[in-house]
């Protein structure tokens, strides 16, 4: 694999905006008459809506009060999402996993950064970064402890194969108010985030003398990416509808052209500075989610009104960015590492006794195919349907997962669904589906989703039984397709699958044992019913 550049099919980056999911925590809003209402956000950057505590659709009226509004069907939502997506040419996109990128801190004309640049530097690229703070929301106190910068996150997720450098510049101040760039159009999409990015780049070039040529790592004439962290709140986690929803997109898809230092700025991602609930700066969760889109990964959460469960807190591309209040996102799953080319799973075919260590420690996973064959190419798999087995433990980046144990994921890859960023919108055709060990799919993120907490076997793959699943000291063991005899017994009684009937030394003297393990150092002839061969101990 090339050190910095791999070829993947990156669909939504080339054709649409990808976004972080709405935060599930409701926001208490005080209305003009002093009454309170709890508002819940749903959807994503393409189309989003709000509900009250009863699940009824609501909207903010011109008089400042929330009122009931007509709920839309899944079909209507999908139609609106499709209309809001500006489509570019569909093609295989050569993704440059850039070793260096630009992060711009951006003030609006009416909202300025509250966080020191030095803190943003440490959070994104610092060595041994730690963060400790507390806050109270709705009478509950949250005590947050986290460690690890965004750079460390991607270093660890890639098993040391990717070490991005994020150069933090700013703050720069754009000319318009937050509401100008962030207000929603009739489809629920932000109006002018592209103009914010373009203007910020131009100002950074002029005021901070940023040399944009150093961010074209593959020298193709285009800056590999720009990440904007904008002042204030974001719409996905409680901010007003006039704030910007964190997302990844292309300026060209919005009809905006930006050129600085002879380089074209196109691919960008953005996220908010402050967390609505703690009123402090956000953790690295949203940054890591959006930057993962830059790398080419799609969203795994449901983007219509369907209520089926997805990967939720188990995955960075679902609700995982909010783990530990947005400070400790889960590491890349085996699938995400496979897709990026940072892990090659082992295809298991024959009966075997399996031992599997924690993914973060080993960077190992297993692949099961119903045909017992696979090309082992993560971003262009053949067959397109397969299973991945990995061991997830509540340590490091996975400390705040709902549980620990063996994770079994079913992949049903579809070019069109990856392209449309609707990977898991259909409950009958999930693209990346967590196989819940307990069989209960009506709850979000629970300990019994994994084996053996939820069950000690899985027989759902015809002729590919996974049985006797155990977990000891963080290590998973199980029998695949019935397993094999105990290794000790097999060595004692067989050689190359056949029973040992006699053993001779090189002088032709028959040994008193047929157990190879009992032999002292030397050269021997091992006899089985059909053959004999020499071994050296």
Predicted feature residues:
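Positively charged n-region of N-terminal signal peptides that target proteins for export
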Residues: 1-6, 537
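Sec-dependent N-terminal signal peptides
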Residues: 4-14
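C-terminal outer-membrane/trafficking sorting elements
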Residues: 15, 486-537
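N-terminal prosegments of processed precursors
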Residues: 18-95, 357
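A residue-level detector for well-ordered beta-strand positions
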Residues: 28, 286-289, 501-502
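Non-catalytic C-terminal accessory/binding modules of secreted extracellular proteins
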Residues: 31, 114-115, 122, 131-156, ...
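Short, acidic, Ser/Thr-enriched surface-loop or helix-capping motifs
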Residues: 31, 218, 505
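Active-site-proximal segment of zinc-dependent metalloprotease catalytic domains
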Residues: 81-310, 314, 318-331, 336, ...
């Amino acid at each position: 694999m090339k050190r910095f550049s791999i070829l993947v099919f990156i669909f939504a980056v080339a054709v649409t905006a990808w976004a972080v999911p709405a935060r599930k925590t409701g926001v208490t809003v005080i209305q003009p008459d002093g009454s309170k209402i709890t508002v819940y956000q749903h959807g994503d950057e393409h189309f989003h809506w709000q509900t009250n505590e009863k699940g009824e659709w609501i909207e903010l009226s011109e008089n400042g009060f929330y009122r009931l509004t007509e709920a839309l069907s899944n079909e209507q939502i999908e139609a609106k999402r499709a209309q809001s997506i500006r489509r570019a040419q569909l093609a295989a996109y050569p993704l440059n996993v850039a070793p260096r990128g630009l992060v711009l801190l951006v003030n609006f004309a009416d909202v300025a950064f509250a966080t020191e640049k030095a803190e943003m530097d440490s959070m994104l690229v610092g060595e041994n970064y730690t963060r400790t703070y507390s806050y109270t929301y709705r009478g509950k106190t949250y005590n947050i402890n986290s460690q690890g910068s965004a750079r460390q996150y991607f270093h660890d997720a890639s098993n040391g194969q990717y070490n991005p450098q994020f150069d933090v510049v700013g703050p720069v101040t754009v000319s318009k108010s937050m509401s100008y760039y962030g207000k929603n159009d009739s489809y629920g999409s932000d109006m002018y985030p592209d103009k914010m990015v373009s203007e910020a780049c131009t100002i950074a070039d002029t005021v901070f003398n940023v040399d944009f040529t150093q961010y074209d790592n593959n020298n193709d004439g285009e800056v590999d990416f720009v990440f904007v962290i904008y002042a204030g709140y974001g719409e996905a986690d409680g901010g007003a509808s006039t704030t910007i929803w964190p997302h990844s997109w292309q300026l060209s898809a919005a009809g905006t052209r930006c050129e600085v230092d002879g380089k074209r700025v196109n691919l960008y991602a953005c996220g908010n500075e402050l967390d609505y609930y703690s009123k402090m700066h956000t953790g690295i969760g949203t940054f890591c989610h959006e930057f993962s889109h830059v790398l080419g990964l799609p969203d795994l959460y449901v983007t219509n009104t369907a209520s089926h469960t997805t990967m939720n807190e188990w995955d960075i591309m679902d609700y995982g960015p909010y783990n530990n209040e947005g400070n400790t996102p889960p590491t890349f799953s085996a699938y995400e590492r496979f897709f990026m080319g940072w892990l090659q799973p082992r295809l298991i075919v024959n009966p075997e006794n399996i031992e599997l260590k924690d993914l973060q420690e080993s960077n190992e996973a297993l692949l099961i195919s119903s045909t017992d064959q696979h090309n082992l190419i993560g971003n262009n798999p053949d067959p397109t349907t397969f299973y991945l087995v990995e061991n997830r433990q509540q340590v490091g980046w996975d400390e705040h997962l709902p549980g620990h144990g063996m994770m079994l994921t079913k992949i049903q890859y579809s070019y069109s669904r990856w392209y449309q960023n609707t990977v898991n919108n259909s409950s009958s055709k999930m693209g990346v589906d967590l196989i819940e060990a307990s069989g209960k799919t009506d709850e979000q993120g629970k300990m019994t989703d994994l084996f053996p907490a939820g069950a000690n076997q899985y027989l759902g793959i015809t002729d590919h039984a996974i049985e006797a699943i155990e977990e000891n000291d963080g290590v998973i063991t199980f029998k695949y397709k019935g397993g094999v005899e105990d290794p000790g017994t097999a060595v004692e009684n067989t050689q190359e699958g056949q029973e040992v009937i006699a053993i001779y030394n090189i002088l032709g003297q028959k040994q008193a044992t047929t157990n190879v393990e009992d032999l002292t150092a030397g050269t021997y002839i091992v006899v089985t019913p059909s053959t004999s061969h020499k071994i050296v101990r």
